[in-house]
């Protein structure tokens, strides 16, 4: 059987930062499949009702706002929050970011009061909406699967960002196998079962097969390099 690897922008950033030994060029890009917008949320009991409330509290006392994320500094979780604070005029590197080793642990940190906000993927929060209030997402407009989640853009913070996930094959994979799997992934996205999973996680379909996926990855490398330099991560 042909082994496959599912990758996301989080893994891709290791190469962009220069601390990874492999990039998409070392494997065979098959297809990009979904996008997951970033989200900032607070506990339901939080006094923060929107992102402006967070910014106001931070400007008054920077030590009063700690941001949880389910991965290390420089990861997608960190970048989402950093971009939001930067758009609000704050120094993104001065915001206290508390990294946890999983999204669930970051959520637990938020709910326990260890942190005041969480920066993560929207899909990560969809199953916890009875416990958290989503106060900003990085989509260009509200998404139908989470209509009550306001965008950062509509609140005056022009932050648009989407994490992606795609499939890669091993070096030497034949073109016929690559095309066959790419077609299969495209067909899967047309099924009602896929739609159920997609809607549950508020993902967006970004099917990019083969050559289109390579072009997408080339553009992502350029954009992520510029973004991480801008934020001082690299």
Regions found by a protein language model. Give the residues of each.
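Conserved hydrophobic/amphipathic secondary-structure segments
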Residues: 1-165
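Short linear loop/turn motifs
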Residues: 95-100, 168-169, 211-216
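Small-residue transmembrane helix packing/gating motifs
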Residues: 159-171, 179-180
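Residue-level signal for the nucleotide or nucleotide-sugar donor/cofactor binding architecture
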Residues: 49, 105, 147, 172-177, ...
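Nucleotide phosphate-binding site architecture
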Residues: 126, 168, 195
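An extracytoplasmic/periplasmic, membrane-proximal ligand-sensing/linker region
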Residues: 175-234
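Glycine-/small-residue-rich active-site loops that bind phosphorylated ligands and cofactors
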Residues: 46, 73, 173-174, 205
